[in-house]
Regions:
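Conserved SAM/SAH cofactor-binding pocket of Class I
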Residues: 62-119
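Class I SAM-dependent transferase core
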Residues: 1-4, 8-73, 77, 114-119
Length: 119
């Protein structure tokens, strides 16, 4: 895995009241790398630059914690998850959640299954 500066990402998460472990940060970085890799062969997202993915996909997904109490064991379904936002990002940040990712396209489901296996 390449080296990434995660300082801003961690700061943005802390501003939401979320402190990520080293393992969670590693999972987000792996997710980012796989997103960019798979996006080269299938259109998962228009946002592929590191800083933008961290802010516009990951932090924005985690920000759901401000509107919805995710500290308790909850069941969440992400309908039309696409590349896994917000569902998979929420699952990484809040492992206590039971998250179901739902999408109509098999290529996206295949991508998500690969990411989940890698994490």
């Amino acid at each position: 895995m390449a080296e990434y500066n995660t300082e801003q990402f961690e700061k943005d998460c802390k501003a939401l009241g979320v402190t990520l472990s080293d393992e969670q940060i590693r999972q987000f970085l792996k997710y980012f790398e796989m997103l960019v890799e798979w996006n080269e062969v299938m259109n998962l997202t228009a946002i592929t630059e590191y800083d933008e993915v961290m802010k516009k996909h990951f932090v924005d997904s985690i920000s759901l914690c401000k509107a919805y109490d995710v500290t308790q064991n909850k069941i969440v379904i992400d309908v039309g998850t696409g590349a896994g936002f917000p569902g998979l990002a929420l699952k990484i940040a809040f492992p206590n959640l039971q998250v179901t990712l739902l999408d109509s396209l098999n290529k996206r489901i295949n991508f998500l299954n690969e990411v989940i296996s890698a994490l």
